[in-house]
Amino acid sequence: MPETTQETCAPAKDSPFFIKNLLNCDSKPSKPRPVLAATKAALEGGFSLSQVGEFNFPRFELPAQRFSLPAHYLERTSAWWYPYTLSSGAHLHRTEVTERPGARDSSPTSGTDRDSPDLVLKTEPDAKEDEDDDEHNNNKSSDEIILEESDAEETKKEELEEWKKRDEDKKPCRKKKTRTVFSRSQVFQLESTFDMKRYLSSSERAGLAASLHLTETQVKIWFQNRRNKWKRQLAAELEAANLSHAAAQRIVRVPILYHENSASEGGAAAANVPVSQPLLTFPHPSVYYSHPIVTSVPLLRPV
């Protein structure tokens, strides 16, 4: 405590807190050293220990008694106060760290390389190839879809054809009827026998078939068709007769009211038989007038 009081009471000239004492600046200005070489070397290969030594940095000294620190520790304040004056290992470590991002920048994905026209020209064909591949894949996909649809349609058609074939197999096969053509002589003889007999026995049918050089089935079928035709003709004739009879019944018969013979006979009978005189009636009941009616004699009118 007494030591500190003595120091505070000391004159201001001996105070260690002056700027002059802190910076330890000399009264005479030192000659400026060439800094261009050091800056060039720093830009080219980074800072080195020898180049840093050329710079004149002021030392910041503090009194040992003020902070109760040893003097040999404070002498090295310039080393830990300025980080770039540390050991060579730290300097090398920093240069390695700074070199790594440079290597990254030198990679082909740097901004300058990206902006180069060669890479742009290279990337354009790649993009075109990618687009061509996409179009090719799209075309393939559409073709595959079309093929799948066509395959599905073909399978459906095949299934329908199989079903149709099965249905045809199930249905009984109907053979087309063979139509026999008869000659005029055969038709005439068949018609004449049909006029005589509508139905033939088995023996008659066999004899007729032998005479006409036909089979019994052909003769049998011809007679069946002829009988059907004959029945249709009879039905048509009956319908025509019924229609005519119905039309005759629809005619209204009007009775005859006057005959000439009956009128002459009636006139002669009237001449022989006296005709009764009718009475002329009037609305008044008490007055009656009798007047004879003369039919044959005309009335005489005065001139």
UniProtKB/Swiss-Prot annotation:
Q: Which InterPro entries match?
A: HD (IPR001356), HD_metazoa (IPR020479), HMX_Homeobox_TF (IPR051300), Homeobox_CS (IPR017970), Homeodomain-like_sf (IPR009057)
Asked whether the keyword Nucleus is assigned, the reply is yes
For bias kind Basic and acidic residues, which ranges apply? 112-126, 153-171
A Pfam family matched in the record: Homeodomain
Q: Name one GO molecular function term.
A: RNA polymerase II cis-regulatory region sequence-specific DNA binding
Name the organs or tissues of expression. Expressed in the ear placode and vesicle and in cells forming the vestibulo-acoustic ganglion.
Any single Gene Ontology cellular-component annotation:
nucleus
Tell me the keywords, alphabetical order: Developmental protein, Differentiation, DNA-binding, Homeobox, Neurogenesis, Nucleus, Transcription, Transcription regulation
Major localization listed first in the record, in broad terms: nucleus
Q: Which residues bind DNA?
A: 175-234
Source taxon at top rank: Eukaryota
Question: Which BP terms does GO give this entry?
Answer: cell differentiation; nervous system development; regulation of transcription by RNA polymerase II
Compartments where located: Nucleus
According to the UniProt record, where is the region Disordered? 95-176
UniProt cross-references to SUPFAM superfamilies, sorted A to Z: Homeodomain-like (SSF46689)
**Function as written in the Swiss-Prot or TrEMBL entry:** Transcription factor involved in specification of neuronal cell types and which is required for inner ear and hypothalamus development. Binds to the 5'-CAAGTG-3' core sequence.
- Give the family from UniProt: Belongs to the HMX homeobox family.
Its recorded name reads Homeobox protein HMX3-A
The record lists the lineage as: Eukaryota, Metazoa, Chordata, Craniata, Vertebrata
